[in-house]
UniProtKB/Swiss-Prot annotation:
HAMAP family per the UniProt record, alphabetical: 16SrRNA_methyltr_G
Protein name (database record): Ribosomal RNA small subunit methyltransferase G
Keywords annotated in UniProt: Cytoplasm, Methyltransferase, rRNA processing, S-adenosyl-L-methionine, Transferase
Keyword match S-adenosyl-L-methionine: yes
PANTHER family: S-ADENOSYL-L-METHIONINE-DEPENDENT METHYLTRANSFERASES SUPERFAMILY PROTEIN
Pfam family, one: GidB
One GO CC annotation: cytosol
EC number: 2.1.1.-
Top-rank taxon: Bacteria
InterPro entries found in the cross-reference section: rRNA_ssu_MeTfrase_G (IPR003682), SAM-dependent_MTases_sf (IPR029063)
Keyword Glycoprotein: no
Main location: cytoplasm
GO molecular function, one term: rRNA (guanine-N7-)-methyltransferase activity
Length: 248
């Protein structure tokens, strides 16, 4: 075995040990194919710089699945997920690979990115379980096809958690859970989020801090439960959640 392959295998084992889950041969092949397709498509459109080696396996795959550690212990269970702002397909496609009985909706407002997501889903054999939607979260959250229809609504947050929560909560069914993936997390952010969630008829179920392997830093996951049906006025019109965020 070459040195590169040994290092790659050791890195993979570290990730699977961290997750307490390991992919089947088919799932591993799907992840490898996904990596190849990302590299190919990156030449056409700017998707992500995290496509090589540890960048892909730790900062993309592991970062997508580690917050779902509990769900990974029972990957056979069927759930409906929606990934908001799916971009290059993480965490949504990683979840679809790891959870073979679940259905995933990938939502992004960029038609270039959703074209990529559709092609990749088909190429790696997931198009029967992945639905790709080109729409803003504020619009999709009011669409009766999607509203109150998911077990999990997920986002790797770029915006503040109180803004992201307004995008996610309207998608949840009565027992659903919103998951916000964050890097750092503070008590101030927690208090602002609590106030925002009160307006959305939701609450923080818990927060959990993870340390990514291979010195990739700290991640926080915020799990949110609905306490009642999300008020009909949310999400507000396009741009308003960012311009006038809840929680203040």
């Amino acid at each position: 075995m070459s040195t590169d392959k040994k290092n790659r295998t050791a890195s993979h084992l570290m990730i699977w040990n961290e997750l307490k889950w390991a992919p089947s041969e088919k799932q591993l092949a799907q992840f490898i194919h996904l990596q190849e397709l990302l590299k190919e498509w990156n030449k056409k459109i700017n998707l992500t710089r995290l496509v090589d080696g540890d960048d892909f396996w730790t900062a993309q795959v592991c970062d997508s699945l580690l917050p779902l550690y509990e769900e990974l212990q029972h990957p056979e269970v069927s759930h409906k997920y929606i990934d908001i702002g799916s971009g290059c397909g993480f965490p949504g496609i990683a979840i679809a690979i790891a959870m073979p009985n679940s259905n995933i909706t990938l939502l992004d407002s960029s038609s270039k990115k959703t074209t990529f997501l559709k092609e990749v889903s088909k190429e790696i054999g997931l198009d029967s379980r992945i639905k790709v939607v080109t729409e803003r979260a504020e619009e999709a959250g009011r669409n009766p096809i999607f509203r109150s229809n998911f077990d999990y609504a997920i986002a790797r947050a770029v915006a503040s958690a109180n803004v992201v929560a307004e995008y996610l909560v309207p998608f949840l069914n009565s027992t659903g859970q919103a998951l916000i993936f964050k890097g750092s997390w503070s008590e101030t952010e927690q208090q602002i989020l609590k106030k925002a969630l009160a307006e959305l008829n939701a609450e923080i179920q818990r927060t959990h801090e993870f340390i990514l392997p291979n010195n990739r830093g700290i991640r926080n996951i915020i799990r949110i439960n609905s306490t009642n049906k999300c008020p009909h006025q949310y999400p507000r019109s396009i741009g308003k959640p960012k311009k006038q965020p809840l929680g203040y």
